[in-house]
């Protein structure tokens, strides 16, 4: 009797299983439960996509629907894209589409549209990418009372660099840190960006703000007092601090630029004011810290001449370590914030392309 009952149950389950198959592609079958299961499924074919500042990217998103649940299409399909904040507490509207009605929000206006590769394609194309476009995006599809979501991460090729102003180390609250990065053609880095930089070899013994409001620093060679001598390498976390009162350095992130970074050939050394004017006379502007890091990391720029930058610092980029030119490692070498009246250095300029 027990064997007969088991056989009956297996037969019923098998029948239900076969009746709820909907073939959507040549090689894909999705199983939708007729009673309580999802009648709408949203998925991203890639969890992460990569691009760079100034480039274009497609955030993949497709939806699969049960044709028996929605009939002949009496419900309009609504597609909404939002950007998630780093703490996942808020969503920033990016794009909404319902039939012929479409709306774009904020800085995305004129830069985003649906790919529309097929009837079930909700992929979003973003053009002329900016540093602020980095992050996680949510694709939401709504039809009638059914809805589902998928999340796609947009990663940008770039470089993370530590920064502190002329005042010295540990002088920036969170909001000042954000502005300091913006002033240097960069944005405040995320934890993921700092973590990737650490995996790439970044070692820095001063704690800095990150975009989520945490304070951390990357150590590849633990030592006293940098992470502790007998500890493992890693990204050290100071935790979350008061954004108004607490003061640290900052980790900035920048990406490819649309222009030319170069060391200006000049017959004499320059004061800071002379350096600014020399770049202007050459049809350019004095370069920013983010631009020297991007040229060094992304273009392999190498120059063993110390030069003024826009923030009043003096630095030089070395991609090929050699005697008297950063012999131990490839790096952007920091000379300091000298007296701006000293006539001791050259200048790095940046000419933007139209």
From Swiss-Prot:
Residues 159-254, 259-351 form the Link domain. Disulfide bonds join 61-139, 181-252, 205-226, 279-349, 304-325. One of its GO terms (cellular component) is perineuronal net. GO terms for biological process: cell adhesion; central nervous system development; skeletal system development. It comes from the Eukaryota. Residues 1-15 form a propeptide. Glycans are attached at residues 21, 56. Keywords: Disulfide bond, Extracellular matrix, Glycoprotein, Hyaluronic acid, Immunoglobulin domain, Repeat, Secreted. It is found in: Secreted, Extracellular space, Extracellular matrix. Pfam families: V-set, Xlink. InterPro entries: C-type_lectin-like/link_sf, CTDL_fold, Hyaluronan_bind_Proteoglycan, Ig-like_dom, Ig-like_dom_sf, Ig-like_fold, Ig_sub, Ig_V-set. Residues 38-152 form the Ig-like V-type domain. GO terms for molecular function: hyaluronic acid binding. Stabilizes the aggregates of proteoglycan monomers with hyaluronic acid in the extracellular cartilage matrix. Belongs to the HAPLN family. This is Hyaluronan and proteoglycan link protein 1. It comes from Equus caballus (Horse).
